[in-house]
Amino acid sequence: MAALQDMSRMATEPLRDIIWNTTAICGWNCGTCCVAATHVHQRKGKVLISTPTLSRYEEVPDDGMGGNPFDRALRFRQSRGLELTLEQKLAVLDHLSGHRVRLDISGGDALSPRENYFLIEEAARRFGKDAITLTATGPGLAHYDVASLAGTIGELNFTFDGPPPDVDPLRPATYATSNLQRARKFAAIGVSTRAECPLTAQNLDPTVLTQIYMQLHDAGIDKLLLMRLFPVGRGELVPDAVPTNEQYRAAIATLRSLEAKYRFPEVKLQCALRLLEGPTRANPCDAVVESFGLNWEGVLLGSPWAINRAGRPADPAWVLGNLVESSLTEILGSEKVRRMQSRAAENHGHCKIFSWLNGSSPGSEERIFETSDPMYSDIADTAGGAA
């Protein structure tokens, strides 16, 4: 009977996109990291791990169990209850069964600790490789055979936002190039690839945007997702890097022109940017309804961007449940989730994260549904009228 109920639900329910930040651990120390990942590196034989704000490092004790520095750092965090064990991650997969899901296995750097490779294999076995996206960085990917990994994922995503400036860079110097170097190998064997480019004050120049597009074109990358810069995670610390509406429009126009000439990568706009090209009947913000975040403690969030500078849920209002402890069926059926989903169209077009950040209501949940996203202050009425 349960199997029949699952089949009936999967035939009618929407696809649930879940970005699963499987670990906080990363080998990079990006200033705008939207999940406030912890930086891990080795120096003079010692493994060091940062706080989410990068303000302090501590030494990871040697537990005698071997592995690379990231494996050691993961076990260190697991011993403190800061990240899920492999058994708990498999319990999450159990609790997703019976639903149409698309899992984006992300981080931190998802593949820096080796146990996550097994997690990807198991997720692909249960849900099918086409339901699995991997978002990773060059160094994380470098430790794995491309063909073997390609057999477990439907798409590879990676961040590529151009060369950082010499002064106050938001990314380490080789971050983007190392990501593309590895992604090129996946594209060469036919794996679907998508570059993700947060638009910031540091990459808006048409020359830089052209360089970004042409490097992706030459590497055979299929898609380029233009993203809004969210002041979440460590991005809270650099609000001046967020472009204006006109800067966003100009950047999109530049890349659309290149797309028209070269055909690929295909330019896609993240939900938060689509209304800049005109009104749409479908609500571009699908937070809480079809798009969710899942953090490294198993907490299901109403948006993948609901993370603060400490790498924690941005506010209890965004917390929907814990997938280690409860099934997705139970969480989606809760009074809180049903209430929030019923209100999703109230601020059509507005990004619910920006509405929450800029709203004036005393209640956090109320702010999520306000028409207070500053990007749409001049176009929200038109967009809402098209709904």
Stretches found by the model and what they are:
Residues D17, T38-L84, H99-P113, A124-L141, ...:
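Core AdoMet radical
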Residues N21-C30, A36, D109:
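Cysteine-centered iron-sulfur cluster-binding motifs in ferredoxin-type domains/subunits
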Residues M1-R16, A36-R72, W305-A387:
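Flexible mid-to-C-terminal extensions adjoining Fe-S/redox cofactors in radical SAM and related proteins
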Residues C26, C30-C33, C285, S303, ...:
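Short cysteine clusters
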Residues E87, L93:
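Glycine/alanine-rich phosphate-binding loops at beta-alpha junctions
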Residues N21, H41-K46, D63, T152-E155, ...:
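Radical SAM enzyme [4Fe-4S]-AdoMet core and its adjacent flexible, acidic
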Residues N116-E121, A142-A150, D205-Y213:
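Distinct, well-ordered alpha-helical segments
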Residues L96, A123-A124, S148-L149, F186, ...:
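Generic structural signal for hydrophobic
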